[in-house]
Every structure is written in C-alpha cells, then in structure tokens.
Amino acid sequence: MAAAAAAAAALGVRLRDCCSRGAVLLLFFSLSPRPPAAAAWLLGLRPEDTAGGRVSLEGGTLRAAEGTSFLLRVYFQPGPPVPAAPVPAPSLAPGENGTGDWAPRLVFIEEPPGAGGAAPSAVPTRPPGPQRCREQSDWASDVEVLGPLRPGGVAGSALVQVRVRELRKGEAERGGAGGGGKLFSLCAWDGRAWHHHGAAGGFLLRVRPRLYGPGGDLLPPAWLRALGALLLLALSALFSGLRLSLLSLDPVELRVLRNSGSAAEQEQARRVQAVRGRGTHLLCTLLLGQAGANAALAGWLYASLPPGVGDPGEDSGEAGVHFPWLPALVCTGAVFLGAEICPYSVCSRHGLAIASHSVCLTRLLMAAAFPVCYPLGRLLDWALRQEISTFYTREKLLETLRAADPYSDLVKEELNIIQGALELRTKVVEEVLTPLGDCFMLRSDAVLDFATVSEILRSGYTRIPVYEGDQRHNIVDILFVKDLAFVDPDDCTPLLTVTRFYNRPLHCVFNDTRLDTVLEEFKKGKSHLAIVQRVNNEGEGDPFYEVMGIVTLEDIIEEIIKSEILDETDLYTDNRKKQRVPHRERRRHDFSLFKLSDSEIRVKISPQLLLATHRFMATEVEPFKSLYLSEKILLRLLKHPNVIQELKFDERNKKAPEHYLYQRNRPVDYFVLLLQGKVEVEVGKEGLRFENGAFTYYGVPAIMTSACSDNDVRKVGSLAGSSVFLNRSPSRCSGLNRSESPNRERSDFGGSNTQLYSSSNNLYTPDYSVHILSDVQFVKITRQQYQNALTACHMDSSPQSPDMEAFTDGDSTKAPTTRGTPQTPKDDPVLTLLSNRTSLPCSRSDGLRSPGEVVYLRMEEMAFPQEEMPNFEEHRSQQVSLSPVAVPTTAASDPECCNIHLDPEASPCSSDSEENMGKKLLRTLSGRKRKKSADGERASEENSNLTPLIT
C-alpha cells in the first residue's frame, strides 16, 4: 500500500508540473491500516482550485500561500445512521454540548516544526491528536474552515471553503527559514467523536509565506523588487530619451545650428554631429537597449507581482478572483508613462542639450552593442543607401515660415519679403504688367511745348513710351524725362528730334517670361522698363507680335516685398485690382485762387483746406452764408492776418488758461471754427463733457450781437480828406422777418438759450468751456472783423452812391470842391449803402450798444488788391488812402433796424457822377472794372423802406 501511496503522490506532482496554473484533480485515499469503524467516513481530500498557482498538492501534502482562499473537496464513506438522541459529550466539543449538533465538521490544528518527517526525538512532546482536536484553544486561527460541509454534487464527496490568513511577521520568517512554512493537520468530527488525521494519512496543510513566487521560488524583499523595477524603467526611459533627442536632430539642422546658432548651440551641435553621423548604428543600439529594458521590466514585474488577486468575504464561499494579466497591465502603464511620455515631453523641448550632455554615455552604449549593432547598421546602409535627411523645397520652406510665425521674431514685412523672393521664380510677367490702356504715352509727332511738358511733369513718370500713328500698340521709342533738361518749351521742339538724338533702346519681353529672368535683365543696366508682348496667332492671318503692356523694375520690387510702392503721382494702389489711392483723384483742379503768400496769411494752410473752410462757412455757418456775406468777401476775410491761428498743446500744463478757447461765464467777442485737432466741451453746471473734432464751430452769437439806432446821424468815415456822414431814415426794418434773423437759437449757431450778454459792452458770455486736447488750427473771427466784412459786402452790393474825387498829384492834396444839395428823405437822391438782400435784422437777445460806442470798420486791414482806376492814364500817380471809418451807434428802445444814408452836403461827390462811392471804393480795393448799375434809377425808391444794419 505504501507503493500505491507513493505512486499517487508522484502522479499528483506530475499533474502539477504538466498543468501549471490548472486545477489539480487528485483523489487521495488513505491506504494506511484501516481505522476504527467510527472514523472510516473520511477517505481523502483534494483542492477544488489552485487559486492561480498558490494552492497545490505536493508529496502528499497540501500547500497554500498565505492570504489564500480556496475550495477543498473531501471524500468520505457514509457511516451508520445518526442516533435519535444526543449523547453527552465534553463541553468543549461541538455536538457534545447538548445542542444536538451531529453535523460533520473539519478544523485544522497547528503541528510542531519538523513534524512533517523529522525524527520522533526532534518533535516536541504534545498531547495526542484526538485530545487536541477536542480542545478549542488548540484549533488553528491562521487556517479557518468557513461554514459546514456542502454537497459536492457527487455521492460520497463534499465541499468546504478554506481561508488561509496572513502570517505574522515573526511566524513568516520562522516558517520561511524552517523549511517552507507552518504545518497544520486536519481534525474531523463525524457526529459522534473527533478524529485526528495527520501525516500518516496525508491530511497535512503547509502554509508558505508570500516571499515565494508563483512556482514556489524564494523572492527578494518588496523594497528590492520595487527598486529593481524602477531601475529597469529608468533604463528604458534613458534609451527612449536618447533615441528621441539624437535621432530627431537632422544632420542638416545640426549643420545649420553649428554655423548660425548661438555660442552654446554651436558647441552642442559640434559634439552631437560626430555621433549623429552614424545614424543606423546609433539607431540599432538605442532600439536594442530599449527593447531589452522593456522585456526585462515585464519579466521582473511578472515575477514580483502575483498573478492571482482576490479575497472574498467569509460568507461568500467562492474562490478568489484571478487576474493573470495584472503584470502585463502594470508593465504597459509604467512603460507608457515613464519610458515614453515623460522622455518625449522633455527631449522634444531640450533635445540638443540632452544629446550633447549624454554623448559619452551614447558612445559607451554603442561600443557595448558593437558586435550586434554595427553589422546590422552596415546592412541597413547597404540596403537603404543614404540616410534620408529633411530637405525643404520652396513650398515646404514657405509653409515652414508661415507655421513658425507665432514663435519666430520675424515681423510681417520680413516674412512677406522672404515669401516674395521665394515666389519670384513661379510668377510670369503677364501677372504683374501694367495694361497698355493704363499707360501714359506720347505720340511721336507731339511737340514739346509748354502744355506737353506740363502734362509730362504732372504725370510723374520718368520713362514714357512713344508710339507712332494712332495705334498705341506700335511703340517705337522711349522718352526719359531727364532728356528734357535742355529743352525749352518756348522753342516747341518736336518730340521726334529728342528721341532720335538719344536713341534709347527698346527692351521687349514675352508675356510668359519669369520675373527672376526679367530682374536679371534689369540688373544689367539696359533699361528699367520693358515692353511686354505676345505672339497673336488668332484668326486666319499670320501670327504677329501684340503689345500687352509694360513692366518696370518697380513692379518686380513690389512683388518681392509683397507691398505696393506709392509715390505722389500714383492713382492706383494696384494695377490689376484698380484700387484707387485714398483722397486722390485723376481730376485736376486749378487752385491758383487759393494760393497764399507770406504777406496775406501767417499760418500756413493748404489751398485745399482753405477751399474746404470757405465752402463750409459759406454753406453751413449762418452768418457767413451768401445771404449775408458774399463769397469773395468771405475769402478775403479768411486771408486776413490773424484769422487763421494755431495753438500748441502742452502736455505738462494741460489746464493752462491759454488752452481754453472759451471759458464759462467769461465774455467774448469772437467766433471760432476748428480746422484741425480735438477739443473738449464742458456744458452747463452739470459739467457734461464731450469731444469735438474738425469743422465744429462755437461763438456765433458773439459776432451777431448788435444794436442800431434810427434817431442819430452817425459819421461813417472820411475818404481823401472828406468826411462821409450817415443820416437816419424814418422808415423801419421791413426786409427780413425775425424768423429769418441769423441770431436764432442754439441749434443754429452752437449757442445756448441761457447765454448772457454783458450790459456794458454787449459781449457774448458763453455757458460752456472749450478746452483743447491736442495741437489745433482754427479760424478766429472777431466781431469787429465780421462787421468790417459786412460793411464791405454792403458797399459792394449798394447800387448808387455819391461819387468822389480824392486823388492828388505829387505831395499836394486837393480837397473836393463839388458837393451835393440836401434833400428830404423822400426825394433825397442819396441812397443807402445796404440793400435788402444783404441786410441783417436786430434781435432782442442781441443786446443794444451804448450811445457813445464807436465801431471802427478798419477797412485798411482787409487785404484787398489794388486795381487800375477807370481814368488810369489821368490819375496814374494818385493813390487810394483808406482811413478808419467811425460809425457811432446809439441804443434804441426797441429792436428796430436803422437805415443809414449818406449826407449829400457832407459827401464829396461830383454832380455828374454815374457811380456811387461804395461801388468805386469796392472796385478800387478788389480790382473789379467799372460797371454801371442797371437799377441805379430805381435804387432810391426801392431802398427807401429798407433798414439794413452795419455793426
């Protein structure tokens, strides 16, 4: 029977060796001498599962690792029937305490060390087995049998759940050093008595510590296993980082860095370039090292981490959950995070520095792997020929520059120039030429007179094609503007004479010529202008050359710099898209009337700005409209000195008084129109602020404040030693209604309904402040200047006036001798100086002047040109002397207008004069020719009821 037992044990070993990690099916029958009939029910046992290799049956002994839970199948022989009445038993034995528990039960008790096969003398003396089985204190706490026996599905077998607890630290070390762990024997309760099954029957359980691997081999401590895994992972990361940092550096890039990088980059590139030159050998070395490190890490983790994991609860009664793929999962995650992601994140940003500092280590690794990697590298070089480097074509280089734009220090203009230079070879002349219809050209039969030369100079071109006949396609010559240096326009030299003398060669290119070729031709100095032509083979006739346009050096430079070069003569920003230059038109205006001289104006403004100012005031500002002031007088007023002024803004003293054009509650007597700059307006007591810019105006009521009197006779002035007096008119204002008064409301003149006027001098008091925010240029017209302009305008529009003769010869002064006779106002031939068309009514809001106030017209300050008098041959030595004309005004009790007449007794005039004084004065100042008034006969009657106002 012993031979049979040994054979069965050998069979179990072979099954374990052949079916690793599989369930060991072993039926172990005790072949020892037959026990008494009461214990014959337990025949043998076997593990139902191996718990991932942690449970096995070796040499007749059941082996399990600590912390394992497994199912145990037991085989038994059914015993006699259970008695009906319980039999008294010791108090500590289950089933014998009077409870009637006759169910079979299994427990484990710990055996002393060496009991598994040591000599009897070496085993410590203990009580017999059955006696120990009865003592509950001797039952093993490290091995528990969970629950009662359950039916095993086969007659004569049952299943029971066994759990092996974790051994304590000292017990694990003693068990490991003593021969493979702690030993436990089995105690069985058959319902009547306890029976001990030990080594004799093969019912032993040996618990081994976890320091043993899945195959039972001894493993190092946990800290040593973790350290080994970290070292292998670091080695894999090292090979991965070297591969990324070294192989990502292209030889071309290293050469560029060595020649154009910084000092540190040049040194690093020099050190790496020697190793990177043997690319295939380096590649094989690094890949071999990384593959070996990854494989070693996987094997180490498989040996260190148990493949079976699980610890079901006490009442679950199921085997542990098995994860044989756990080492592979841990190895994959560690390699992915530690050996791929981290090295790539670092080496992709600092690859050159890492590669240069690890050159010595790389050389050592290449030398270690030389026997394997060098032949393989040579084989790859022979099979794949030369190593493929990163070479950029023109298109790839352009895209690289565009992609690197956010990270490079290239500005947009530099990038455009590089792009234009690289695209120069891909463009042809036809894409950049100027069509023939847009070219400025001259006929060959033209004459270089003043008009032609002026047109050439106004065009702004320096090279002008010359065509023959009526066909602009027939270009026969080129005219350079510098060829006209010795040409006098008064000589009317034929253009053909100049072109034949210089004989400039024509440079013709075809429409499909590349721009780089044309640029090379221009660089040779032949010409900077080429005629673009193409072969026209359309139709049935013979092919011929057709001129499409011209191309210049400027066109090619514009394509290189990717921008348009505009000069003062360009009308279009792009010859192809026909986009006009802003604020530049082809139409030419003659602004000679607005060309100013130094004596006329102190602040320099352009004629265009003067024209715009004149048009704006004449159409938008009520007091300066043609209804009240003629455009000619307005222009002379704008040319008057000190009318257009400039004011500089001081950043350091922003609140200086000189920075205010108007201050709230401070009287003023001038009007301001802003031409350039910005101002800030503060309105009312609330201090509301807003900004205004060019062509905003203020203070219109300041120049419109006036008063008149119809009771007093006022002295107008003297001309050539004679006085001119103004008489009152009994008639009242009837020409304009109050709704037509230029001093209306704030909406018309920028004033306010709450604005005040000084009672003493009728000055306008604004309720707002105007403060400049930058350098400004503005028009400033005082009330006196405006009144002078009104007087001149009224005198210009007066139909009749007494004539005068106030011109002297030499140094003598000749007083006038002819006077008129006084007449009544109704029959008086003396007419008013103002007409109904140019009269200005009074307003109650304007305020009235004091009786003693005198208004000086100061016509000598108006810059009027002198003209030749009608009898210039007789009076060429006489001059016109203008003196201030005093117009005293008096206050009126109501807002009535005054009618001002000339006193015939006080006015020096000729009895047979056909021209009034106002006409002659205005004609003398403005340069107009003498013209008789068609309405002279009806002037007195028509103006008898008009009461215009001069203030």
UniProtKB/Swiss-Prot annotation:
Residues 218-414 form the CNNM transmembrane domain. CDD domains: CBS_pair_CorC_HlyC_assoc (cd04590). The chain crosses the membrane at residues 23-43, 222-242, 282-302, 319-339. The modification Phosphothreonine is found at residues 821, 824. The keyword Nucleotide-binding does not apply. Keywords: CBS domain, Cell membrane, Ion transport, Membrane, Phosphoprotein, Repeat, Transmembrane, Transmembrane helix, Transport. One of its GO terms (biological process) is magnesium ion homeostasis. The modification Phosphoserine is found at residue 850. The keyword Phosphoprotein applies. InterPro entries: ACDP (IPR045095), CBS_dom (IPR000644), CBS_dom_sf (IPR046342), CNNM (IPR002550), Ion_transp-like_CBS (IPR044751). Residues 114-138, 731-754, 795-830, 903-951 are annotated as: Disordered. Predominantly expressed in brain and testis, and, at lower levels, in kidney. In the brain, expressed in hippocampal neurons (at protein level). One of its GO terms (cellular component) is neuronal cell body. Its main location: membrane. Residues 920-932 have a biased composition (Basic residues). It holds the Pfam family Ig_CNNM4_N. Residues 731-740, 814-824, 942-951 have a biased composition (Polar residues). Residues 433-495, 502-568 form the CBS domain. Belongs to the ACDP family. Probable metal transporter. This is Metal transporter CNNM1.
